[in-house]
């Protein structure tokens, strides 16, 4: 049914490259306006957020390039897999997003797509793109932290 369940959430899809390619500044939860066959396809655990992003057009937030495959039992009522989907946020949240995007060089990136209390939600991040050197620094920092933890584990076991 779903890939994992965390805190009452059934995660359908996650954008694993987003945390690698972007520095996450702030995270929002938004509802997604879907058609019936899209929900059925998501309940089967089929979706991809790779290369997807969100934009703000005329005061509305849209999820673009997210792939939800056609429902296999659907007929002529099936949806288009890569159509633009409206995200449901409060006006105040949209206004703060618009202000922050204008203020700095930020992007809206979906982190995960999940079911919460029977409704489809998307975890949307206000993020800044990382340069190659930033990615290398993060990898070096992670490797150093891993080595420290490994050494502490060895000392705790009395191996050194």
From Swiss-Prot:
Keyword Cytoplasm: yes
An example Gene Ontology biological process: trans-translation
Predominant localisation class: cytoplasm
MF (Gene Ontology): RNA binding
Keyword RNA-binding: yes
Disruption phenotype: Not essential for aerobic growth in vitro, has a 20% decrease in tmRNA levels. Increased sensitivity to antibiotics that inhibit translation (chloramphenicol and erythromycin) but not transcription (rifampicin). No change in sensitivity to pyrazinamide (PZA). Unlike smpB, the gene for tmRNA (ssr, 10Sa RNA) is essential. Strains with ssr or smpB disruptions are not more sensitive to pyrazinamide, suggesting the prodrug does not directly target either of these components of trans-translation.
Cell compartment(s), UniProt: Cytoplasm
Transmembrane segments: none
GO CC terms of this entry: cytosol
Keywords from the named record: Cytoplasm, RNA-binding
Family (UniProt): Belongs to the SmpB family.
NCBIfam families from the UniProt entry: PRK05422.1, smpB
Known role: Required for rescue of stalled ribosomes mediated by trans-translation. Binds to transfer-messenger RNA (tmRNA), required for stable association of tmRNA with ribosomes. tmRNA and SmpB together mimic tRNA shape, replacing the anticodon stem-loop with SmpB. tmRNA is encoded by the ssrA gene; the 2 termini fold to resemble tRNA(Ala) and it encodes a 'tag peptide', a short internal open reading frame. During trans-translation Ala-aminoacylated tmRNA acts like a tRNA, entering the A-site of stalled ribosomes, displacing the stalled mRNA.
Name assigned to this protein: SsrA-binding protein
Species classification: Bacteria, Bacillati, Actinomycetota, Actinomycetes, Mycobacteriales
């Amino acid at each position: 049914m779903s890939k994992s369940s965390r805190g009452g959430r059934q995660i359908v899809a996650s954008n694993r490259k987003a945390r690698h390619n972007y520095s996450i500044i702030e995270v929002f939860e938004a509802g997604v306006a879907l058609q019936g066959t899209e929900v059925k396809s998501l309940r089967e655990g089929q979706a991809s957020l790779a290369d997807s992003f969100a934009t703000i057009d005329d005061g509305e937030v849209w999820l673009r390039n997210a792939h939800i495959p056609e429902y296999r039992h659907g007929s002529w009522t099936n949806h288009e897999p890569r159509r633009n989907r409206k995200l449901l946020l409060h006006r105040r949240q949209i206004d703060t997003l618009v202000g922050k995007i204008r203020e700095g060089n930020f992007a809206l990136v979906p982190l995960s797509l999940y079911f919460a209390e029977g409704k489809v939600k998307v975890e949307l991040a206000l993020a800044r793109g990382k340069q190659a050197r930033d990615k290398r620094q993060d990898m070096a920092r992670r490797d150093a932290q891993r080595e420290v933890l490994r050494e502490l584990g060895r000392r705790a076991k009395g191996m050194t």
